Amino acid sequence: MPNRRQFVQAVAGAAAGVLGSRGPVFGQAQGPARRQISIAGRRVPVVDIHAHCGVAPVAPVVKGTAFEANGNVAGGQVLNAARVATMDSQGVDYQALSINGFWWYAITDRDLADRIVRAQNEGLAAWCRQHPDRFVAFASSSLQFPDLAAAQIEDGVKRLGLRGAAIGGHVNGQDLSDPRFDPFWAKAAQLGELVFMHPNGAENIIRTGALGGRGDLGNIIGNPLETTYFLSRLIFDGVFDRFPTLKVGAAHAGGYLPSYFGRTEVACDVRPNAKCANTKRPREYLRSQILADTMVFSDEGLRHLVAEMGANQIVYGTDVPFNWPLTLDIVLKASFLSEADKTAILGGNLMRLLRIR
């Protein structure tokens, strides 16, 4: 599993080469004046669901442990004025901040895991209180201890004012559809909070080293593959049936699931060994309980995503501080989207789900 040091190196690499369509990278001191987005002459908010960061209070908690390197916060993951300036230049009004949960899932010391998450959640909440008109944040949780994770997200939401939870796609190789994790899912559903999943290179399903070499395939293939597997497990193992009010957001446009959903839709009909636990058609979950960000990078990719999932299930995402092409103008220029659809995708859906006023 990549540690925080490798993550920081990747952030630094992203900052070194800016894609032309993106604008200033995170960490630059000052960007252009704030870009404001309007549709049909009406100002609309833009909310970014896919915004990586770290918080400094974690470092002293992990100092002297095997996880000390994961406590480093540097470069574009730092929460500072440069981040706000870059948001301004890119037309982003709000970021929904998240910290990768999988940095800590290998910790077996329950007390240490709890103290790390408390430091993260309190650090995120403090930043959001300082900038309530620009940031909300997903709560972190110690998913390796599902009962603790449930308590942590409740504390994050009720005491700290955080919105939902950010998780990885598995816990040390164990599928999150396993009933062991039901206390976490039950709490998220009870609270009515969105759970945002970010993958980590499909290490749970790919042979070690298989995605090495050229092309950064661990990211390019592995991340969407892990997301596809994660969502498929939630569908076919009945998680969405056990928790019918649960809503799950998936990074990287929902992985490959929407791209080849016809195969998923008929699996329980044509495969006698599928042993499906779901009680509804897979598409019903796709169009009601699953959300995906806009990171498809093309007009046709967005058209297909909306056709499969519906505009109410699509939300804007950038993957900052990594310098992927921005998709804001793809949404704005999409001839197949109504003004209402564009407004919903860019911010309306998340304003509602994350209770942004």
Model segments located where?
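Aromatic-lined glycan-binding groove of carbohydrate-active enzymes
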Residues: 236-238, 244-282
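Hydrophobic faces of well-ordered beta-strands that scaffold small-molecule active sites
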Residues: 47-51, 95-97, 137-139, 165-167, ...
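Active-site gating loops and adjacent loop-to-helix segments of metal-dependent hydrolytic enzymes
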Residues: 43, 52-78, 107-108, 114, ...
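Short, surface-exposed connector motifs at secondary-structure boundaries
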Residues: 132-137, 161-163, 244, 284-288, ...
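Active-site gating/metal-coordination segments in enzymes
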Residues: 93-238
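Short, flexible hinge/linker loops that cap or flank conserved catalytic cores
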Residues: 39-40, 189, 242, 284, ...
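Mid-to-C-terminal alpha-helical segments outside catalytic/metal-binding sites
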Residues: 2-45, 49, 55-94, 122-130, ...
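Acidic-and-aromatic substrate-binding clefts and catalytic sites of carbohydrate-active enzymes
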Residues: 73-77, 105, 143-149, 172-179, ...
